[in-house]
Design a protein with these regions (language model features):
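ABC transporter nucleotide-binding domains
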Residues: 1-168
């Protein structure tokens, strides 16, 4: 079985004004299709930096990767991928659920519309069909009364509901 995600020799440094900080050192792992994996470690151990590296969300050049670092997702080398290719993958093939969804959800937009926008952006669906799909996804992650919650703002939901919205 070929791996969906292959991390080899991941080394991430933050280039600060007067020094370089080595945030992630020699991380290696593989994840196969349909495999569920948790990234566990102490606070400050590099879990978030590793995840953000996989998504290529770190601010470059302030964050840099060693030359021998490799992140291969679905056969494509992520560290050398162009922005358009990355944009097409994010949200449709790969995504990240942040610990605190309030920092990821726009507080000025209804949660259902935020899901709908992601669907509309990545799939060729009408607004009405993408709205229905958003409601179905909310139901799939067990948001009670999803049709009405579609119009809720993030602050109107519990922390667990906000995390499930991000999963949807």
């Amino acid at each position: 079985m070929s791996s969906l995600l292959n991390i080899e020799n991941l080394n991430v440094r933050f280039n600060l004004r007067y020094q370089k900080f080595h945030a992630v050192k020699d991380v290696n792992f593989k994840i196969n299709s349909n495999e569920i994996v948790g990234l566990v470690g102490e606070s400050g151990s590099g879990k978030s930096v590793t995840a953000m590296s996989i998504m290529r969300l770190l601010p470059e050049p302030k964050a840099s990767f060693d030359k021998n670092s490799k992140i291969i997702f679905d056969g494509e080398e992520i560290l050398s991928a162009n922005k358009k290719s990355l944009r097409n993958k994010r949200g449709s093939k790969i995504s990240m659920i942040f610990q605190e969804p309030m920092t990821s959800l726009n507080p000025f937009h209804q949660v259902g519309r935020q899901i709908q926008e992601a669907i509309f952006t990545h799939q060729s669906l009408t607004k009405e069909v993408s709205k229905q799909k958003a409601i179905e996804l909310m139901e799939l992650v067990e948001i009670q009364n999803a049709h009405n919650k579609f119009n809720s703002y993030p602050h109107q939901l519990s922390g667990g509901q906000r995390q499930r919205i991000m999963i949807a």
